[in-house]
């Protein structure tokens, strides 16, 4: 009983702090796996406001997945690693409040099939799994499952077995299970890698409509990311080498980061179209502003 009263007390404190401090702050985060000499993350410092979409990009082995694992609590709770530094959410030290934080986040990692419960007979049951465990009323569960399935384009698959789905549908199912309980933080590591172009476009259209939830997303879909991200973080060899709004980051890429410029930016460079501050446009909104100025 004492354990649950402590948990509830910490949860109430955290929710109250949300109104006072709406930031997520990472301070001097360094992560090293056992048996490795070099850290996978080195002195990461960043700050975002709640409700923002944060795009995490970088080449292979830059530390993107490791950062996701830390943010999700996979490191060190499931995967062993040495961590220095810390991060705070809504003014609370996350490492001191793991049970509370885990109840407030949703996670989609690179192996979405491995995240499914394996206990559900249907897609609907899989989406409902966490809500059932929370003791939600059956009618409310059905309503919420249908809402999330509609958002993820799975409404026609609700009565199918999860293992019968395609790779892209499995990814959408994993996202559905991650968002069904309305998490405060959503962490997604390459969530569209197996989706077809239509599925990917629908996913990013959905992401553009997400409000209040803070989203961390690793993706190589640069064009789509520029349309939805409030902030972009660039990792290179375990270090945060750039962070800022998409237009700021992509107009100052270093060659050794090996990150392609967005298609719109490449077009604008060929046409020599600039925004008023001299930057090249990187998304549709920027491009419309530039074309209006040139007409």
Predicted regions and their residues:
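Catalytic Walker B motif of ABC-type/P-loop ATPase nucleotide-binding domains
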Residues: 186-189
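Conserved ABC ATPase signature
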Residues: 161-165, 169
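Conserved H-loop
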Residues: 221-227
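Conserved beta-strand-loop-alpha-helix hinge in the C-terminal portion
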Residues: 239-264
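ABC ATPase NBD Q-loop/coupling interface
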Residues: 84-100
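Conserved ABC ATPase "signature" region
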Residues: 139-157
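The feature captures the beta-strand-to-loop junction immediately N-terminal to the Walker
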Residues: 57-59
């Amino acid at each position: 009983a004492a354990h649950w009263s402590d948990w509830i007390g910490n949860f109430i404190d955290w929710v109250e702090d949300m109104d006072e401090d709406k930031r997520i702050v990472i301070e001097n985060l360094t992560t090293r796996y056992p048996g490795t000499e070099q850290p996978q993350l080195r002195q990461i410092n960043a700050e975002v406001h709640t409700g923002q979409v944060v795009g995490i990009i970088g080449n292979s082995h830059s530390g993107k997945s490791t950062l996701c694992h830390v943010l999700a609590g996979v490191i060190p709770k499931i995967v062993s690693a040495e961590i220095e530094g810390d991060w705070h959410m809504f003014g609370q030290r996350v490492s001191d409040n793991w049970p509370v934080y885990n109840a407030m986040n949703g996670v989609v990692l690179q192996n979405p099939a491995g995240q499914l419960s394996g206990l559900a007979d249907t897609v609907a049951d899989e989406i409902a799994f966490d809500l059932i465990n929370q003791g939600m009323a059956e009618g409310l569960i059905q309503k919420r499952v249908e809402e999330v399935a509609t958002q993820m384009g799975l409404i026609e698959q609700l009565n199918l077995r999860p293992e019968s789905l395609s790779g892209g549908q499995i990814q959408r199912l994993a996202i559905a299970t991650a968002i069904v309980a309305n998490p405060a933080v959503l962490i997604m590591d390459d969530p569209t890698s197996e989706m077809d172009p239509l599925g990917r476009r629908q996913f990013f259209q959905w992401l553009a409509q997400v409000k209040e939830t803070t989203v961390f997303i690793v993706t190589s879909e640069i064009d789509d990311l520029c349309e939805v991200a409030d902030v972009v973080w660039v990792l290179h060899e375990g270090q945060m080498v750039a962070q800022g709004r998409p237009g700021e980051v992509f107009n100052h890429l270093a060659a050794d980061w090996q990150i392609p410029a967005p298609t719109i930016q490449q077009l604008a460079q060929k046409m020599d179209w600039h925004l008023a501050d001299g930057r090249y446009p990187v998304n549709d909104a920027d491009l419309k502003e530039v074309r209006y100025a040139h007409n």
